[in-house]
Swiss-Prot record:
Gene Ontology BP annotations: bacterial-type flagellum-dependent cell motility
One protein family per Pfam: FlgI
Species this protein is from: Vibrio parahaemolyticus serotype O3:K6 (strain RIMD 2210633)
Gene: flgI2
Its biological purpose: Assembles around the rod to form the L-ring and probably protects the motor/basal body from shearing forces during rotation.
GO MF entries: structural molecule activity
Record-given protein name: Flagellar P-ring protein 2
Length: 363
């Protein structure tokens, strides 16, 4: 019987009751973030694995027209070495013109593979429609595909998505509010009122009283110098301050697909008794032949004979006293050889009965 593995996500695993963390590890500066860029382009040079869709042909003709090449009226180029693609990139904060970023290229048509292709010059735009980077280069595709003359086909990984390392050049800097105003705001990665207040107290102990204040469960506002050069040194000192974040809320995370169960250390059980068993129903159909006596005038017929067998496992009962943890429950379930699915069913029943002090989240 597969045993249940319980992961206790608890700071009690460390040597101290509360583990100090740097501000930069639990919070980020408001406004200092990456920005997503996207563009539409063409990949050329494919070994017959491209496409001949109408929008690809239209894009191909428009590209030729930009180079002064006009196709004769009514001409439809039959191209199999070109594919229409979407190009995406993430522009890090404070990126400057001339710096390079990685891009991801993915087919949006019926191309079979992008392996061996080259992305032609593609403008990457932000949410405001402005061009912030230009991408171009040879694709690296980890997937592959092969097709035989009889229609047999082999595909490995995903051959219609490729990467270009440092494939886009930044052309424009995105404005950043970092140097404006009298305050810098830190946003916690995990919202918590206690953590926000402890962080503000740590900053005040370092800078002086009333220099920082917790705005809500997420944001901590710190008074900062207006000079940008001083602000960088100021922020460097602040983000390396250490303090003790609050313990997380009592949660149980259950992955129903893998059977993984993660339990926080503050989860407790109220007094409860649980019994859990299983029933198996097996139906077997037998066909019997009914043969009448000679000269009786009867007919030989086939008569179905159903055999139904029901087996029910003995339900094991667990009784818990006040203050016990989920670790005690898992240990008890493991002792009787139950499966992870049994523990999931027990957890759901306990939560519905109000016997679990914490959140039960099933993913």
């Amino acid at each position: 019987m597969k045993r249940i593995v319980l992961l206790l996500m608890s700071v009690a695993l460390f040597s101290t009751a509360a583990q100090a963390a740097r501000i930069k590890d639990v919070a980020q500066v408001a406004g200092v973030r990456s920005n997503q860029l996207v563009g539409y382009g063409l990949v050329s040079g494919l070994p017959g694995t491209g496409e001949a869709n109408p929008f690809t042909e239209q894009s191909f003709a428009a590209m030729l027209q930009n180079f002064g090449i006009q196709l004769p009226p009514g001409t439809k180029p039959k191209i199999k070495n070109v594919a229409a693609v979407m190009v995406t990139a993430e522009l890090p904060p404070f990126s400057k013109p001339g710096q390079q970023v990685d891009v991801t290229v993915s087919s949006i048509g019926s191309a079979k593979s992008l392996r061996g292709g080259t992305l032609l010059q593609t403008f990457l735009k932000g949410l405001d429609g402005q061009v912030y980077a230009v991408a171009q280069g040879n694709l690296v595709v980890s997937g592959f595909s092969a097709e035989g003359a009889d229609g047999s086909k082999i595909v490995g990984n995903n051959p219609t998505v490729g990467l270009i390392s440092s494939g886009a050049t930044v052309e424009r800097e995105i404005p950043n509010p970092f140097g404006r105003g009298d305050y810098i705001t830190f946003n916690l990665l995990e919202s918590d009122f206690t953590t926000a207040q402890r962080m503000a107290d740590a900053v005040n102990n370092f800078l002086g009283p009333q220099m920082a204040s917790a705005v809500d469960a997420t944001s901590v506002r710190v008074r900062a110098p207006r000079d940008v050069s001083q602000r960088v040194a100021f922020l460097s000192a602040i983000e390396n301050l250490e303090f003790d974040p609050a313990d997380g809320a009592a949660k149980i995370i259950v992955n129903s697909r893998t059977g993984t169960i993660v339990v926080g250390k503050h989860v407790r059980l109220k007094p409860a008794a649980v019994t859990h068993g299983g029933m198996t129903v097996a139906i077997k159909e037998n066909l019997n032949v009914s043969q009448p006596n000679s000269f009786s005038g009867g007919q030989t017929v086939v008569v179905p004979d159903s055999d139904i067998e029901v087996t029910e496992e003995k339900g094991k009962m667990f009784k818990f006293e006040p203050g016990l943890t989920l670790d005690d429950l898992v240990r008890a379930v493991n002792e009787v050889g139950a499966a992870p699915s049994d523990l999931m069913a027990i957890l759901q029943a306990l939560k519905q009965a109000g016997a679990i002090e914490g959140q039960l989240i099933i993913i």
